[in-house]
């Protein structure tokens, strides 16, 4: 533990790490012209025949700081990113600080159940899964044995298919999430969650 001179902050651990992850795939029937398998992008008529692809852009680096202050108690600061941005540039995946069961920053959304997601080779993940990240302020209550309750306020992000008449507008309110989870061992749990959100859009009607 390294304490800063003249302050009440004690740094217990800090480090930088990461991993290299590479995948290879062979498409026998020209399903999708993308390194990720996105079912919505499958064309009605195949445009591509056999093709081989490799990708290492999901390699990840992270920075982590663990410490203690009288005001915040034990705290953790964590940032991580990979190279899935445009043209394989760096893309932020997590950037948050947690203390006294409060999390502030950019991390996994409160409506998703991260522990229920299966491991997949494809970076896109399982089809139909609820997976997203959001800038948020969240609180987790752990005062009851085997139970965990969480509530969060999140920055809204709406993604959808648009057209010349339909556009996604600026959102007017944050998203609100809440969840309750019961665990009876290290690998089994039941979780109930809900979300309140407003999705604002504009629609231009053409009169003939």
Language-model regions: role of each:
Residues 1-6, 11, 206-207:
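Single conserved hydrophobic/aromatic residue that forms the stacking wall/gate
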Residues 4, 16, 191:
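Short glycine/serine/threonine-biased micro-segments
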Residues 13-36, 44-158, 172-187:
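Outer membrane beta-barrel
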Residues 162-205:
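Surface-exposed beta-loop-beta
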